[in-house]
């Protein structure tokens, strides 16, 4: 009886304790937290807006963690906070972002997590370093009950941004903090190294894998195969394939596609076909060709001009049940256009449409380009009109193809009008087409028109480059208008644009032709980088004016800059030409022997200059002797000079009429 009473009293006391707890004063943040959660569950955004000024990052993070089992709703809240809360838009946003990343990775919403990471590290976003993001993720790791997958995701975010160094730093720091990224993250990093052409670094990381406790998977082997194929080492790639089989790792279709594409790019179509035919046998009948496989082979044959074989592979592709796609048709359309069969290319486009495929901008560009190359202006413009009628958005390649095509065929006025329409509609903002128009106006000696193009570029706010200025500078220099050329150059410098070697060489050439050798040499001395064209220009002008001493000095400078490599065939031809003009024939012959000794092979210009000069001022025997010497050095004779000068001498020597 007493036990029963005691039990009831205990129960009563416990109930009293809970009631007391229930009616105790809760913390203000707890009240706000409960209100936020209640309204968030019912998506009452207008009501939530009333609390925005009271939000703190710890509170935001707490709400996000509360909804870890509802990641979609948590993400909606996170995005709402970013749009409406001033606190979260400051540097304090970072804490909530890290919590959100943990929740998204935990719920396998990797794309959303990667998007937040990319925004944190982008110039448009917070512009945080990968290591800064990593530190935030590590701080919130425990509270969010996260997994190492979050570090894999950060590595992937870096590699997607092309930041190989950032990915490396994350991997190293993660290891230093007692965590470890998976082999998938390491594969991502190594793939990024290959994409940015850091081949040596790729091999270094690959060789360290085993010592770090990683086991290669099929993706690792595929990367190694890709690396060898990238360097056209097909035999080594095949060796890796067989090593993969010995390790008990079965290949996938990517393994074969890497090798087949590598073979096609090196032109080894026989090897590509062998791999295509043996895919089943080499994979234990687990792998069969897909659209990528067939497209690689079709593209390879198209590049080789073997359209018959490309069509045969397309037939095999259809028979095997693999549908042709835009890439299949794109390769064939381009190949038929290159072969001058535009009608067949257009027929393929109709076939595409009948199969429900879209003729994309790339394919249209290809057709327009080859029609212009054939000189079929009306056909090209008709295809362009068809693009417009189908609301197909033209890109900068379309614009460049049309402008160049019209200019190339003499329709410069039409090209200007087309460019004007593009600029007015603001469809594409690209300086390449403006530069093309300037080039053609300069070539046609319409410098005032070229000036107008430059002016319109400035009005449109386009960022001019060295080609824009260089084209106009070269045009004015060729017309002998040195002062105007220098005005444009000064304008370029005032706009903080960097000159290049081509512009400097044009100015040096212009000054030299005006007899301003001193000024030309001063420009050369001020140039940080000089090339063979720079020196050849000075050398030519020095020899033209008979200043042999100055020419000798220039030749010495050339040799000092880069040894004998800097003295090219053009240099020797300039020297031989001027020595012959000054009557120094034996000296010219010495220069010839000097160039041969240094491994520079004479060409038909060398042959023509020497044979013509020797035929006028030396005996017939000397001419024939010189001809024989040049032939022995591997020179192909200048046809006209050989037939008109040397052949008659040889016939006379052999007693022929």
Curated annotation (Swiss-Prot):
Belongs to the PPR family. P subfamily. The keyword Protein biosynthesis does not apply. InterPro entries: Mito_RNA-Proc/Resp, Pentatricopeptide_rpt, TPR-like_helical_dom_sf. It is found in: Mitochondrion. Keywords: Mitochondrion, Repeat, Transit peptide. GO terms for cellular component: mitochondrion. PPR repeats lie at residues 147-181, 182-216, 217-251, 252-282, 290-324, 325-359, 360-394, 395-429, 430-464, 465-499, 500-530, 531-565, 568-602, 603-637. Pfam families: PPR (PF01535), PPR_2 (PF13041). The keyword Isomerase does not apply. PANTHER family: PENTACOTRIPEPTIDE-REPEAT REGION OF PRORP DOMAIN-CONTAINING PROTEIN, PENTATRICOPEPTIDE REPEAT-CONTAINING PROTEIN 1, MITOCHONDRIAL. It comes from the Eukaryota. Coiled coil: none annotated. Residues 1-74 form a transit peptide. This is Pentatricopeptide repeat-containing protein At1g11710, mitochondrial.
């Amino acid at each position: 009886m007493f036990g029963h009473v005691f039990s009831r009293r205990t129960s009563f006391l416990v109930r009293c304790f809970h009631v007391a707890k229930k009616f105790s004063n809760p913390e203000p943040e707890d009240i706000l937290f409960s209100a936020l959660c209640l309204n968030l569950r019912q998506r009452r955004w207008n009501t939530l807006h009333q609390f925005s000024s009271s939000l703190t990052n710890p509170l935001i993070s707490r709400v996000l963690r509360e909804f870890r089992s509802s990641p979609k709703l948590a993400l909606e809240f996170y995005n709402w906070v970013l749009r409406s809360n001033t606190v979260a838009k400051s540097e304090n946003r970072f804490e909530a972002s890290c919590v959100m990343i943990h929740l998204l990775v935990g719920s396998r919403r990797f794309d959303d997590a990667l998007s937040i990471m990319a925004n944190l590290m982008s110039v448009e976003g917070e512009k945080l370093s990968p290591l800064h993001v990593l530190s935030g993720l590590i701080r919130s790791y425990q509270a969010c009950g996260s997994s190492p997958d979050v570090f894999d995701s950060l590595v992937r975010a870096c590699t997607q941004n092309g930041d190989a160094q950032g990915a490396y730093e994350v991997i190293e720091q993660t290891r230093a903090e007692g965590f470890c990224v998976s082999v998938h993250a390491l594969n991502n990093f190594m793939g990024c190294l290959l994409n940015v052409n850091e081949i040596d670094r790729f091999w270094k990381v690959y060789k360290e894998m085993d010592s770090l406790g990683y086991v290669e998977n099929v993706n690792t082997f595929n990367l190694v195969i890709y690396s060898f194929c990238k360097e056209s080492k097909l035999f080594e790639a095949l060796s890796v394939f067989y090593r993969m089989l010995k390790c008990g790792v079965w290949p996938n279709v990517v393994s074969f596609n890497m090798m087949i594409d590598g073979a096609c790019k090196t032109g080894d179509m026989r090897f590509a076909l062998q791999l295509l035919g043996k895919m089943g046998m080499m994979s234990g009948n687990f792998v069969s060709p897909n659209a990528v496989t067939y497209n690689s082979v079709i593209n390879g044959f198209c590049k080789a001009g073997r359209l018959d074989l490309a069509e045969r592979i397309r037939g095999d592709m259809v028979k095997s049940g693999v549908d042709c796609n835009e890439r299949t048709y794109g390769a064939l359309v381009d190949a038929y256009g290159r072969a001058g069969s535009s009608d067949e290319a257009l027929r393929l486009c109709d076939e595409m449409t009948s199969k429900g495929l879209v003729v994309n901008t790339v394919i249209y560009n290809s057709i327009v380009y080859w029609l212009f190359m054939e000189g079929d202006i009306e056909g090209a413009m008709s295809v362009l009109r068809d693009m417009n009628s189908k609301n197909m958005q033209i890109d900068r390649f379309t614009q460049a193809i049309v402008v160049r095509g019209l200019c190339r065929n003499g329709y410069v006025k039409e090209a200007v009008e087309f460019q004007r329409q593009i600029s007015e509609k603001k469809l594409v903002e690209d300086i390449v087409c403006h530069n093309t128009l300037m080039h053609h106006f300069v070539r046609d000696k319409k410098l005032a028109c070229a000036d107008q193009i430059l002016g319109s570029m400035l009005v449109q706010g386009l960022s001019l480059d060295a080609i824009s200025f260089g084209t106009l500078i070269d045009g004015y220099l060729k017309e002998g208008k040195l002062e105007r050329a220098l005005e444009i150059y000064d304008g370029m410098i005032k706009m903080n644009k960097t000159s290049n070697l081509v512009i400097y060489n044009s100015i040096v050439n212009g000054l030299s032709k005006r007899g301003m050798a001193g000024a030309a040499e001063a420009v050369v001395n001020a140039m940080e980088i000089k090339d063979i064209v720079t020196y050849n220009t000075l050398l030519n002008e020095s020899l033209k004016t008979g200043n042999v001493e100055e020419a000798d000095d220039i030749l010495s400078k050339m040799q000092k800059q880069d040894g004998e490599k800097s003295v090219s065939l053009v240099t020797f031809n300039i020297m031989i030409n001027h020595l012959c003009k000054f009557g120094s024939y034996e000296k010219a012959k010495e220069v010839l022997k000097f160039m041969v000794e240094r491994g520079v092979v004479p060409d038909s210009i060398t042959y023509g200059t020497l044979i013509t000069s020797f035929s006028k001022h030396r005996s017939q025997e000397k001419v024939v002797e010189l001809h024989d010497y040049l032939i022995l050095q591997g020179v192909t004779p200048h046809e006209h000079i050989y037939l008109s000068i040397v052949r008659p001498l040889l016939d006379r020597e052999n007693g022929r009429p």
